[in-house]
Amino acid sequence: MMEPEEYRERGKEMVDYICQYLTTVRERRVTPDVRPGYLRAQLPESAPMEPDSWDSIFGDIERIIMPGVVHWQSPHMHAYYPALTSWPSLLGDMLADAINCLGFTWASSPACTELEMNVMDWLAKMLGLPEHFLHHHPGSQGGGVLQSTVSESTLIALLAARKNKILEMKASEPEADESFLNARLVAYASDQAHSSVEKAGLISLVKMKFLPVDENFSLRGEALQKAIKEDRERGLVPIFVCATLGTTGVCAFDCLSELGPICAREGLWLHIDAAYAGTAFLCPEFRGFLKGIEYADSFTFNPSKWMMVHFDCTGFWVKDKYKLQQTFSVDPVYLRHADSGVATDFMHWQIPLSRRFRSIKLWFVIRSFGVKNLQAHVRHGTEMAKYFESLVRNDPFFEIPAKRHLGLVVFRLKGPNCLTESVLKEIAKAGRLFLIPATIQDKLIIRFTVTSQFTTRDDILRDWNLIQDAATLILSQHCTSQPSPQGANLILQTRGPRALAKEMSFPSVNGAGDDPAHSRKIVMQPPRVGASPVSRHLETLLDPLDDCFSEEAPDVTEHKLSSFLFSYLSVQNKRKAVRSLSCNSVPVSAQKQLTTEGSVKNGSSSRVRIFSRFPEEVMMLKKSAFKKLIKFYSVPNFPECSSQCGLQLPCCPLQAMV
């Protein structure tokens, strides 16, 4: 058994281990290489009858536990949203765990209750929340409380809204059964809302409707008003709206300035879920998303995500605490105390009875960092995300289908979903960074969140190179797996590729570049000077894409083949064969060496694009022949180019280009 002196010694040993772990976590593989049930074989069937030595227990941390850990504090952890910790936060919980009070009432631990009330007022002011969310403000009937999760906070808000509405309905229908009234209730959220909102509806037995969002993935007032009108006509009673600030998928923001007035007019409880983005409101420049917050009946966010206060720690504020207390109040004799009518008892603000002393770690973090350093932390994470966004935008093989907000960038490989899925699987094999998918508008996307306070530009560049290398491998495999077109013999072998290439040009209109919106107009036919053998053969082929091309032929600048093809195929949606235009002039056998010696060390991508070698000279082919150049199929393997590109017939003799 451990005695105080041994605890002192072992405690120092554990602090040293924690310091070593957190300062070197970037060197560890982010995700574990284990299978479900890996731990079972390493533990005895039954608990030990006699005590183990601490040395044995401590040794099993690295032997048994760490091989199965996902390292959430790693700068290379980009999945989900942050779950950060910090030295002051760890110290705070060390003390709170030693005190180990159960602060269900003021009398059970006055310091636990009163520190929480004051720290929640601090935090509300730091975020710029309305004064009606403060405990200590003249005329305020609201206040804040720490919950375990945002999921729990959303459920609590919905239960409070349900109770309040049922009491109103019983005033006019006193004989009605509460279960009958409950069956008529309906609540709303956007179709981008977190899964916990749906779960809250299931638990409370309130119908939860998920409303469509606009092009920016934001829930707007028009959609809400329409749903309310339709449901009232059906005899339903709308009671609750959950607006999300910073959705899980793409970090989109619902429009509070439109939703708020509707909720106030229609008598709906407006709850704000800002689980991740709430920390950003420490910075005044991000508070534009809070426009309309004065209409909110409740607001919740997680300091345990981005604010460096480790899990669990969720802030939850209500405008009217009495509506909350009437939902959860119980009054057994053994919980009463002399100051019950005067003091705040947080057991009436939550589902459980007992509660941890969470406010100590939050207090330690706010005091140790100060508001300015917490703001700097948020701005640093946002700048790192901007840097990653710039890297993605500069690569023509990727696209960003939704606007970046704060520290989250969503991106995907151009082409079908299977390519993006394959890239994720390839990245997961190595475990050197952790990414997860999401879907928007039937597109599979990759979420890249800057999670660590220690992330540097070098970390971002290193991870981007790993993503590029995985994409290069998947694209080359995808291309080489496609059959060569049987019409290749239509290209006369006597006409060399260099001669053919001299007649090829791909114009760009008004500097449109890679913008797909301009792609329908960039395939133009220059005046015909003479017919070559190649063009005569191509003209004999069927031309199913005649309606896709413009007849205009303005005098425009030249444009590289790769950029043109990506833009054209994106607009035309011709993605049924080879989904990639990846070309690599290095044999597959040499790609591994190139990846190791090139991309990681010097910070540049290992991809060598054959398209960059294409001559940009005038092509004298008829429109129908020209279209054959961009048919989206694979080409045969070349002696020095084991990867294949997305050109059809005219590309077959291009092997001499490499």
From Swiss-Prot:
EC number per UniProt: 4.1.1.22
One GO MF term: histidine decarboxylase activity
Residues recorded as bearing N6-(pyridoxal phosphate)lysine in the entry: K305
Record-listed substrate binding positions: Y81, H194
Catalyzed reactions: L-histidine + H(+) = histamine + CO2
Gene3D superfamilies: Aspartate Aminotransferase, domain 1, dopa decarboxylase, N-terminal domain, Type I PLP-dependent aspartate aminotransferase-like (Major domain)
The entry's keywords: Catecholamine biosynthesis, Decarboxylase, Lyase, Pyridoxal phosphate
Function: Catalyzes the biosynthesis of histamine from histidine.
Protein name, per record: Histidine decarboxylase
